[in-house]
């Protein structure tokens, strides 16, 4: 039986820190960790963040997408390194610069027994960008599609208004549902009535804010997963998740804090799985307003001119930050310094990009050159529950900027508040610490979301909370995204990434290292996209 699985990423709320598990109690529980799990047993996975909906098209949010990937398939899947692999389409072929043919997998059935056909693809691609009330649409992945045509039950031809060589990458984010649920409500998915997929599991129960219960799909085209039942249990607090593993309450834990890595490595009955992820931690700046509210003089009055609009000031910020200290000392190896929007080795990332090394003298010189020889005051807003050590990183960066002459104050808050106030239509802040996971596994994903000029209709600038705009960058990115020849597209993306860093459109700081823990007897292939998927947890001797 062919084995080919999938996943994908995007923003999500993380830990709320309402629960605290003392380190000594975690150690005591680890000492009593039970024997290896067997495949015949159900599997319980502790996740960090709750999915908000069981509707796979409602919100392009990581917890939602991860839940969907258990129940639904996509035309194209991604492997652990985000390479494209066959999903419900066995192959995809460009017929011209603007036309793609997707050959669909035959013999596939939804978990209610109905056949999967081209009609389901047409309905899904029509529904995904147009779900009422969606706080984060999938429209960016379906931009430019002008028609989707069935040629028999097992062939789909997709036409775009301009060349889109990234269409297969984009379609790896869009779940396929039965055509009859084209107009189904979110409630119909919550109850399970419409949550019918072709994926390795079927949805038994979904409880918003708490998780989901799944049952194995024994007829899955890639072979039945090893677990008869799966519980996805949301435990927001890092320590509480690890303690649940130690107590034998769960079998798999995501988002293990780096501070506990050494402890866990010495514990019998626990296995760790880690990889450098593509999740970028970065600083974003308000460059749209002439006066910005949180850049002030010594008396706290907003400056007459927004200093963050000057690229020299943004470059000074970059030179003020000691990325090595953040990654190694503060996060204990839980991150790696970032010099671009994706780690080296991903498609479209320039080898010329290197993380800035801290140079306080050069930072002060740039501030003086920008007419700010005595610096200014700045408030940094960021999350305190989005990724491990996020509040510590925020506080540390504020301290580093202060040493360079930008007297900075950290203002941590829940991620939900940061997102609601730091983006459209409010744009309340001046400088923000955010993170971003590259959905498509290549450089256009962060560039079109974080750096491109905001254009909702075109699906560009969805994460551009500073409203940076550079028409030269936009033209270069658009050229890259419509260039069919891969090496030419790679070169254009590299140039676009270099331009974004040179102009300090954002300031890349860190790439997170993702860490999972399992009970002995289980294996998990760590993924660059950070997804935790039960179908990839396997028994091992």
What are these regions (language model features)?
Residues 22, 93, 101-103, 137-182:
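Surface-exposed binding/hinge segments that line
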């Amino acid at each position: 039986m062919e084995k080919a699985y999938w996943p994908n990423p995007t923003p999500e709320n993380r830990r709320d820190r309402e629960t605290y598990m003392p380190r000594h109690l975690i150690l005591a529980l680890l000492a009593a960790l039970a024997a290896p799990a067997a495949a015949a047993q159900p599997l319980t996975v502790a996740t960090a963040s709750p999915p908000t909906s069981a509707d796979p098209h409602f919100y392009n949010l990581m917890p939602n997408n991860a839940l969907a990937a258990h129940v639904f398939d996509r035309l194209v899947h991604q492997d652990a390194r985000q390479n494209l692999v066959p999903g419900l389409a066995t192959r995809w072929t460009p017929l011209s610069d603007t036309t793609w043919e997707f050959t669909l997998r035959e013999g596939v059935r939804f978990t209610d027994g109905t056949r999967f056909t081209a009609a389901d693809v047409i309905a899904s691609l029509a529904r995904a960008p147009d779900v009422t009330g969606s706080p984060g649409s999938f429209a960016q992945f379906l931009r430019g599609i002008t028609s989707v045509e069935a040629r028999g039950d097992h062939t789909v031809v997709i036409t775009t208004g301009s060349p889109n060589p990234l269409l297969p990458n984009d379609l790896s984010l869009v779940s396929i549902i039965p055509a009859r649920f084209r107009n189904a409500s979110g409630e119909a998915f919550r109850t399970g009535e419409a949550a019918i997929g072709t994926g390795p599991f079927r949805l038994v129960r979904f409880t918003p804010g708490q998780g989901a219960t799944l049952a194995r799909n024994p007829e899955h085209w890639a072979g039945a997963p090893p677990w008869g039942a799966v519980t996805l249990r949301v435990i927001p607090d890092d320590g509480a998740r690890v303690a649940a593993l130690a107590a034998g309450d769960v079998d798999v834990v995501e988002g293990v804090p780096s501070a506990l890595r050494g402890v866990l490595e010495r514990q019998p009955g626990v296995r760790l799985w880690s990889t450098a992820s593509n999740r970028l931690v970065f600083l974003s700046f308000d460059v749209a307003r002439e006066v910005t509210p949180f850049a002030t003089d010594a008396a706290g009055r907003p400056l007459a001119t927004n200093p963050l609009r000057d690229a020299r000031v943004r470059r000074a910020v970059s030179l003020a930050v000691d990325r090595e200290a953040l990654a190694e000392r503060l996060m204990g190896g839980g991150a790696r310094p970032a010099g671009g929007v994706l780690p080296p080795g991903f498609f479209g990332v320039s080898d010329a990009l290197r993380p800035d090394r801290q140079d306080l003298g050069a930072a002060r010189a740039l501030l003086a050159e920008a007419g700010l020889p005595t610096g200014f005051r700045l408030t940094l807003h960021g999350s305190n529950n989005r990724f491990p050590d996020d509040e510590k990183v925020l506080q540390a960066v504020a301290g580093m900027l202060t040493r360079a002459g930008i007297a900075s104050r950290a203002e941590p808050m829940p991620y939900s508040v940061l997102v609601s106030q730091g983006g459209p239509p409010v744009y309340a802040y001046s400088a923000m610490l955010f993170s971003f996971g590259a959905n498509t596994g290549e450089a256009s994903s962060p560039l079109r979301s974080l750096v491109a000029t905001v254009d909702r209709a075109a699906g560009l600038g969805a994460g551009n909370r500073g409203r940076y705009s550079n028409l030269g960058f936009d033209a270069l990115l658009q050229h890259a995204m419509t260039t069919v020849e891969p090496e030419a597209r790679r070169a254009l993306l590299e140039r676009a990434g270099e331009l974004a860093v040179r102009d300090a459109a954002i300031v890349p700081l860190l790439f997170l290292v993702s860490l999972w823990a399992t009970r002995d007897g289980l294996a998990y292939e760590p993924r660059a996209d950070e997804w935790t998927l039960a179908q990839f947890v396997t028994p091992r001797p």
